[in-house]
Amino acid sequence: KLCAIWIYLDVLFSTASIMHLCAISLDRYVAIQNPIHHSRFNSRTKAFLKIIAVWTISVGISMPVPVFGLQDDSKVFKEGSCLLADDNFVLIGSFVAFFIPLTIMVITYFLTIKSLQKEATLCVSDPGTRAKLSSFSFLPQSSLSSEKLFQRSIHRETGSYAGRRTMQSISNEQKACKVLGIVFFLFVVMWCPFFVTNIMAVICKESCNEDVIGALLNVFVWIGYLSSAVNPLVYTLFNKTYRSAFA
């Protein structure tokens, strides 16, 4: 019984960690594509609802574990250790909890970068904006924040203050994208070995050495766990706001 609970919590928290990254990727893309809507309806309540949605999906994905684990111990207990032994769940769970979110993250991240580059080009090519940005050319110009996109969609700001705000937002957005890019890269590097090996354990049962596969899974799963521990370090290392918050 304890094995079913242990594996359920393991799958739940790992899936929730992955789904949160996927939600962040989607949220950033929506903020860039539709800044007016996102800025108007972005609130603590909306953020809370997004978090609830992530946890609901995570619970839904992991719930089969206690359902079949409490009924049949052989599906969660093998050779004296707690081990998920249901091949169907391993395959389906790996795709739903990792490969599908990974695909969404990769696509939305590159679409976000593309949109930011496009908006930055439009911002710099605008004659009025170009004049205001000339004295701030030392700042990166490859991205644009959703906040400034929202303001540009409503009205044109004038004066050097607006220029500073625009370029500061561009710089902040670029830094944010870099941090997210690093987080996503570490996510892939640290979780991909486990899920690939997890699928191999099911597909090549006859030809693969079970002891080797089992040993690899034990190592790779801990590397995956470290992914969540590394994220706060990445945020604090590359973002002053997070450094101040954790100080």
From Swiss-Prot:
Serotonin binds at D10, N198. The modification Phosphoserine is found at S135. The keyword Magnesium does not apply. The record marks L84 as: Hydrophobic barrier that decreases the speed of ligand binding and dissociation. The chain crosses the membrane at residues 2-26, 47-70, 88-113, 178-203, 212-237. It is a multi-pass membrane protein. A motif (DRY motif) lies at residues 27-29. Residues 1, 71-87, 204-211 are extracellular. GO terms for cellular component: axon; caveola; cytoplasmic vesicle; dendrite; presynapse. Its main location: membrane. G-protein coupled receptor activity is regulated by lipids: oleamide increases HTR2A-mediated activity. GO terms for biological process: chemical synaptic transmission; G protein-coupled receptor signaling pathway, coupled to cyclic nucleotide second messenger; phospholipase C-activating serotonin receptor signaling pathway; release of sequestered calcium ion into cytosol; response to xenobiotic stimulus; serotonin receptor signaling pathway. Residues 27-46, 114-177, 238-247 are cytoplasmic. The PDZ domain-binding motif is involved in the interaction with PATJ, CASK, APBA1, DLG1 and DLG4. Interacts (via C-terminus) with MPDZ and PATJ. May interact (via C-terminus) with MPP3, PRDX6, DLG4, DLG1, CASK, APBA1 and MAGI2. Interacts with GRM2 and DRD2; this may affect signaling. G-protein coupled receptor for 5-hydroxytryptamine (serotonin). Also functions as a receptor for various drugs and psychoactive substances, including mescaline, psilocybin, 1-(2,5-dimethoxy-4-iodophenyl)-2-aminopropane (DOI) and lysergic acid diethylamide (LSD). Ligand binding causes a conformation change that triggers signaling via guanine nucleotide-binding proteins (G proteins) and modulates the activity of downstream effectors. Belongs to the G-protein coupled receptor 1 family. This is 5-hydroxytryptamine receptor 2A.
